[in-house]
Amino acid sequence: MNKTLGLILTSVFLLSTLGIITGFVIPTQAANSNDAAIYTIPSVTSVSNTSNIVINLFFNATSNSTVGAQASAFNYGLAINYTLDAITFTVVLPSGTSYPLIKLNAKNFANYGYYDLAHNSIVLLLNTTASSTAKELAYSYEQSIGVTPSASYKIYNYTNKTVNVNQYMNELPLSMLIYMATNGKYNNLASLPVGTKLEFTYAGVTYIIAVSPTVKLVGELLNPLYTANSKMLPGTNYAVGRSNITVAVYDNLITTTTSPFNFTLTYSSLAPALIYWFVIANTTYTNNGASTPTASFQAPPFKQYFPSNSTILYSAAPTKSSILMFNGQMNVTAHENVTLTLQTGTNIYTSPNFNVTPPGNYTFSGKLGVGFNGFIYQNGSATLTATIFNGTINFFFSSTGQKAAFTFFLVPIVPINLGDNNGATVIYNGVSLNTGFPQVVVMFNITGNFTKSGSNYLLYGSVYEAELKPLGSTQLQKLAGATDSTQFVGNLISSASSPLVSYFNYGESTTTITGTSLSFTVLMPLKFIVERLGYIYLVTFHIWGPSATVTVTGVDYHGTQIALGSFRAYVALPSFYTLPKTPLVGLTCDNMYTLAQVSDAGSVLETSTANSNANNATVIGPYDLMSNAGLHVAIYNGSKLVKSGNLGLLPNATTAPITTTITLNGQTVALTYSSAPTAIYPVDFKFEPGFSYSVTTNVIYNTSIPTYVVTVYMPLKYILQTKIVMWYVSPDYAAYFYYSSTGQYQTSNVTLTFANVTPELVMPQVFPVGKLYMPFGINDPYYVFYSSISIGPQSGVIEAVENGFNVGNITSITVELNGMNESIVLSPLNVSKLLISSNLGEVSQCSPLFTTTLFNISALASLLGLPNAAALNGSYLYVTYHDIISGAYVTNRTLLVVGQFYVMPPTTPGSVEWILTAKYINATTGIPVEISYAVVQQPSAKVVDINAANASITQIQVTGVKIVSKYATVTVMYNPSNASTIVYMNGMFVASYGGNLISSLSETSTFGVYYGAVVNLYVATGTLSSPNGTMYVVLGSHKVAVGTANLYTYAGYHFGPYTALPLVSNVTFTVQDPVTHATLTGQTTLGAFNNTPIRLAPLGVSIPQTAQYKVFYYYSTPLVLSPTSQYIVLSVTSVISYPYPFYIETVSFLGYNVTTGTPVPGTPAFQTVYSPSLGPGVVLQVPVQSYQFISLSTPSEPHTVVMFAVPFAGGPAISLYPTFLVYANVTAISS
């Protein structure tokens, strides 16, 4: 019974805590400072009709002279008796009705009175709820009035004997007084209307205790998981199973800084509970010749129970089903005691330790109707069928006076192994099922009885349900000794003799007429308690799930009710992603991790960085029986699995203060509490070389959210074949239970692979041998893990090694000299001479490039038997490297030269595009014409200038150009004396401009190599009537005309009697070293090539204006020609202005997609095309009539129609891209 604590308790507690008093010793007769005749400690002037407290009601001995005299004479027993005789009690209703006074005479109430020496008062302990005498320790009484319990505190009973601190005191039921006073009309406090007064009168003083309205305190539930990350949950009123949330209560009836509260959680679900039961045993009972009952279900034949591995073994399969099912609504209640702390300056108590699925007892309650159907035969026999769950039990009675019973034991079937002492596996005929035995075992006894009373036939049915107490080791060992079903059932029945819960109900039906059907239903609660693993059962029975609601109520230690509201169950599903996306390029350097992140609100059970079970410490198993929960990593070499493991759950964020506010009854407080984790789990993956596959883990705690680091070691030669698969399994059993079929209780697999990257050998394109020591490097992203690479001779190669790992080998060094290849034997002696360094160093932190000055060019010449390094001038140094990771062999080369300023062969020729067509004479005659179109490639060259590169000069200047052809010569030169650029043609002055405007060459990415056009030329586009456009030399913003383009270059042609020879010009150029001012001369050419102007395409298909040469374009869409649709329409355009007539020549072949053989008909058809405006951007739609090449008179098989452009009948094709347009599937029909 909870006791009401008042201000005295608080004061004494504070005084003793502060050390102001060392004990609580009260002198006889002098301790009571309260001179009221009647009073209470703590003060109670009203109670609600639902109050559950004990009221300490004091009657002052000094207020009654007779009582006082007895107390002074130490006759405490007589003082009690005289006091009781002087007390009257009555009940006054709100209407004013007053019941007659009753006396608390010593005859009836003496054993309830006590003399408290310290208070010099007689005290009654009024219990507001008890219906009969209740007791409490004197220790508890002393605490309730605010004193420190001790043996020196004196309390006497009506026999004048001392009541020691460890002895019991009788509590007077207030219900007894109410019943006596109202002559039985009201029998307890709860039955009295609000406003009723309970009046105690003594020594002329009346003490009134009013019946007040029921007080219901207000409270609220807050979910810090939502506060920490609102994206994690659908709303504030959702909670993940097993997690803690914050509870706040407004309670102005208590004043202690901390206080216990008792909360009741009621779980309900919109979905029906679905419970599968396994029948572990069954038996029957009969008397007076009744037949043995039969059932549609039965247990398999028992063989043995093994407690050591929690297994029940059956010898064979049952002949009938052993599984029953309950499908109906079920409510569940659980209780949770939580200590709340008072927030300063308010009446609000809070705690962050309210668990939404506490580990304590869960009471499951549903409705089970057992239907009985009977029939009384005319011969006086009867049958009775009981339907329970989805099974039936059949009774047969040959005559009245017979009775039979069917008893069976059920255990729930669960999807997972619940562990020893919580679950057992049943095995029969190869079938294996997990069950809740021995924790949840329910027995049902169904009894049928057939009797006759007078002329009435009576069919009677009863149902007895009992839940066995969780079986202990003694009972389990007894069950283990059973050798057959009879012994096993007997042991179970004996264990059911003192059940955890039990219920009984019966029904009956009577008739006087034989041949009559009878029916009745026995309603049962199907109520059982789960003492351990309650969360597992909540989920398994479909209570905690997506449609579950939890209503929370409570009481403080006064018994005052609290309304807290409700919340919804939330089953969270994990997610997982990585950055960067696969495939990866390279190993891991320093903190350049492959980042991954798991998000799972269902992982909140583990709320500390050490992953202790902070939320639900009594849960069996670290992850709520989800032993495979956590991060999984599997490593494959190709398709072969080489390593797989569960790395376990990930470390949660360190808890940090989270502040929010709550307002209750107008009071607002800021709540600061340690947050639940945000359920975001960063994972960093590192990939490093190893001699074998292995995985290590560690945690980085330098951030608020710890980072889990997973390092995967891989043999270098297998990296590209390695596949790493990762996934995360939620530890929440609800996620597994509801989503195991879809697999969403775990994340989708994240697969990491590695890209095949070929390393690059970094060597100068050109190296002057005079510098003697040539640089060398390797660029490979898979090397970023290293800071340097050692190189040295090993078995005929130059081995590259880091930390004992061979990353690659230089397999050959060859020199191409004077057309001959000479290889260097990579012996240790030769390598020691050739290499001037034993290490390649990374150019910067985590760089894929490793370089050093490596090759001794003088030693190279010596190894080749050359007199000196200059003898290597013009040779190429080839180096071949074998990369262990990719397996690739890569080669690069360097041109070795003596000088530092020269033209690199080969140079790039310039090129002018010409359009080949024909000038129209008549329909069958024309003259070929080439029309200048454009310069498509400027004459260009590469020049090596080491001096300019060393001086960081990015451009070198062309100082002179001479273009020489058979018909003309153009000279462009820079005159430094007057700083001007001058142009001559055939020795004659043409133009002059200030500055050097010829051209400049820009440095490429290769050291010392400069590239660009040596002169910039422009050719105007000609026409059919004036085909030779003017050529210009471009000098800055100036264009200088130097005659027509055909003076310098011509593509040439040969058609019929017409022939034109091609023309090419030589281009000589001079460049100057800006450092030494030395000049050098090089040569290239200016050439030409032919193009054709017309572009063709099927109607609706776009025509590219410029494109690479294409001979055929195949149009495979079927075309059907008929007398009403006789045309094939195509699109035609030209890349130049072409205001001249030309023809679309059409040839037809029999068959689908046939372009060879004999055309049908034998002669081609021609369609004239003419538009004065035809040119770039102008598209003509040209219809070609079909009767010219396909007969429409009779249905035909498919034809292939080929079209191309010609300047006249029999002329050359002048269409390009395509040259031939092919309609591959053309059919003609007659109508």
Curated annotation (Swiss-Prot):
> What does the entry say induces or represses the expression of this protein?
Constitutively expressed.
Looking at the UniProt record for this protein, which Gene Ontology cellular component terms does it annotate, in alphabetical order?
A: extracellular region; S-layer
Its subcellular locations are: Secreted, Cell wall, S-layer
Q: Which residues form a coiled coil?
A: none
Q: Which domain of life is it from?
A: Archaea
Question: What disulfide bonds does the UniProt entry report for this chain?
Answer: none
Assembly, in brief, is:
The mushroom-shaped unit cells of the Sulfolobales' S-layers may consist of three SlaB subunits and six SlaA subunits.
Q: What is this protein called?
A: S-layer protein A
What organism is recorded for this protein?
Saccharolobus solfataricus (strain ATCC 35092 / DSM 1617 / JCM 11322 / P2)
The primary gene name is: slaA
